Amino acid sequence: MTVQTAQIVKNYIGGEWVESISTKMEAVYNPATGEVIAQVPLSTKVDVEQAVLAANEAFKSWSKTAVPKRARILFKYQQLLVDNWEELAKLITIENGKSYNEAYGEVLRGIECVEFAAGAPTLMMGKQLPDIATGIESGMYRYPIGVIGGITPFNFPMMVPCWMFPLAIACGNTFVLKPSERTPLLAARLAELAEEAGLPKGVLNIVNGAHDVVNGLLEHKLVKAISFVGSQPVAEYVYKKGTENLKRVQALAGAKNHSIVLNDANLELATKQIISAAFGSAGERCMAASVVTVEEEIADQLVERLVAEANKIVIGNGLDEDVFLGPVIRDNHKERTIGYIDSGVEQGATLVRDGREDTAVKGAGYFVGPTIFDHVTKEMKIWQDEIFAPVLSIVRVKSLDEAIEIANESRFANGACIYTDSGASVRQFRETIESGMLGVNVGVPAPMAFFPFSGWKDSFYGDLHANGTDGVEFYTRKKMLTSRWEK
């Protein structure tokens, strides 16, 4: 599917591209230009019903398909993603807005997720104990659980779906995906390539839409589990409603990630990492560096370096060469971000770089320039809330103890980083910080697909995280077999 031909995005149900029964449509915009590039249907629960029934029917045979055969389809799928790498990256940039280089990297992360899922024969192995008692043996076997629902966000339209459905189907499940209505084109292309790889009809289905589709998945009795990535309020809603309907749920939510810079840090390295982590993907990622806590002795130096580097950032259409910072996703998100910048000024923070004044902000598209606040306190909204935009807050502290104390007061706990050369400081940070993914001299400590994406507190709802062995546990259930064999 190309942008030029995707005037109306269709649902993908039972291996067929079908129109939604809904007549309601929502425009899909190129956020760099404001141009409408497609129309996506706001599908209904009837559409969800059709997709779930197709997935449930496909489960009967797919769950019995030999695990190596499932893996071979995924290996072919991985190669097709590689073959179409540049096309996929361009499509991400057009509908999401991030720079082409970042989109290219996102495709890589998606491919890595498929590679991990293709290892299903090893991941699905059970356990055996031959002699739990005289002549008696016990074994554990893994089985798929059924139809899975996946609800994905706009900010990583390839990587997050590839977190979900490849591993789920590798484990023998079937899948109904609801991509973000803001970025549906990439999901459609993923389905086309899955079909080309030989994935049977009904194993992967896509229903486009908004609230009705989400509720349809959460309420349907044949949907056995829900994987969600998105904002904190919606994640909490999905978790509560899903579990009320007796579903297994993993819901990845918001973040307010703290980066701690100590006196012995390599400031050149710290500056480079923080700039990339704070302003990459326009700050629209749950691992973005949104708060820096820096020891007072080096605070002036760090702020000066950060502002100088932020001033060098090229802002514009992500398809243009040398652009680093693209737009935020929609005009209302741009206005929301400007509202947070206004509140930071009103609450007394020092605005040392004003992203409202960049030239690109005044033109077409939904641009906000890199914004840096100094002298931020934890009473301010810009410290408390997830802004999900290129806005960085700097808090000055007297010690590592104070920095950790401040970070731990946040209700979010996705990631945290420390910049230091001290092993003792790293150990203290590791043992006392309340966060699930940690970095040492690394700006974005997002793990590879074979490790769990492990947020804490209000950054995650559930027991089993996405990816890694947690993902395998989430998408499977166990049978225990105890046998007595006598001569």
Swiss-Prot record:
Keyword Oxidoreductase recorded: yes
GO biological process, one term: inositol catabolic process
Broadest EC class assigned to this enzyme: oxidoreductase
Oxidoreductase keyword on record: yes
Keywords annotated in UniProt: NAD, Oxidoreductase
Signal peptide boundaries: none
Transmembrane segments: none
Assigned EC number: 1.2.1.27
Record-listed NAD(+) binding positions: F154, K178, E181, R182, S231, E386
Reactions mediated catalytically: 3-oxopropanoate + NAD(+) + CoA + H2O = hydrogencarbonate + acetyl-CoA + NADH + H(+); 2-methyl-3-oxopropanoate + NAD(+) + CoA + H2O = propanoyl-CoA + hydrogencarbonate + NADH + H(+)
GO molecular function, one term: malonate-semialdehyde dehydrogenase (acetylating) activity
Pathway: Polyol metabolism; myo-inositol degradation into acetyl-CoA; acetyl-CoA from myo-inositol: step 7/7
Gene3D superfamilies: Aldehyde Dehydrogenase, Chain A, domain 1, Aldehyde Dehydrogenase, Chain A, domain 2
Active site annotation, chain numbering: C286 (nucleophile)
Family: Belongs to the aldehyde dehydrogenase family. IolA subfamily.
Biological role: Catalyzes the oxidation of malonate semialdehyde (MSA) and methylmalonate semialdehyde (MMSA) into acetyl-CoA and propanoyl-CoA, respectively. Is involved in a myo-inositol catabolic pathway. Bicarbonate, and not CO2, is the end-product of the enzymatic reaction.
Quaternary structure and partners: Homotetramer.
Protein name: Malonate-semialdehyde dehydrogenase 2
Source organism (scientific name): Bacillus thuringiensis subsp. konkukian (strain 97-27)
Organism placement in taxonomy: Bacteria, Bacillati, Bacillota, Bacilli, Bacillales
